[in-house]
């Protein structure tokens, strides 16, 4: 009975994200808030994949037990030509995959590429790990995974 109560809300989160994506004409399954992403991961219904660079994960932090497939590499953020193959090797094309980057922009591009490659349930984590820039040109003061107090660690 408790399991059903957990499954119902997370299923509803995905359906709502799909509906919003369809209305917006997004080329991937949709976007979810950091809080909804964490609920989906905790329920076991989704896998979280961090698409930031190794350097970002090392110096800024990362979500425990998240997978890592870099969308781009190095300080110049050169696109990883193996991204789709690496993602498929780690998740398969039919898993519910939540992609996380710094602010939600790169992960949206990664979600689009994955969807074009045949991933059927790939979602963007809105706001990203650090969030959007504020008026002072700093991240983390108004939104993002860390701002919401969700689990993260740093090397």
Model-assigned labels for residue ranges:
Residues 1-46, 55-96, 107-155:
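Rhodanese-like catalytic fold shared by cysteine-dependent sulfurtransferases
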Residues 48-50:
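Structural scaffold elements adjacent to functional motifs in cytosolic proteins
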Residues 99-100:
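Short, surface-exposed ligand- or partner-binding patches at beta-edge/loop junctions that are enriched
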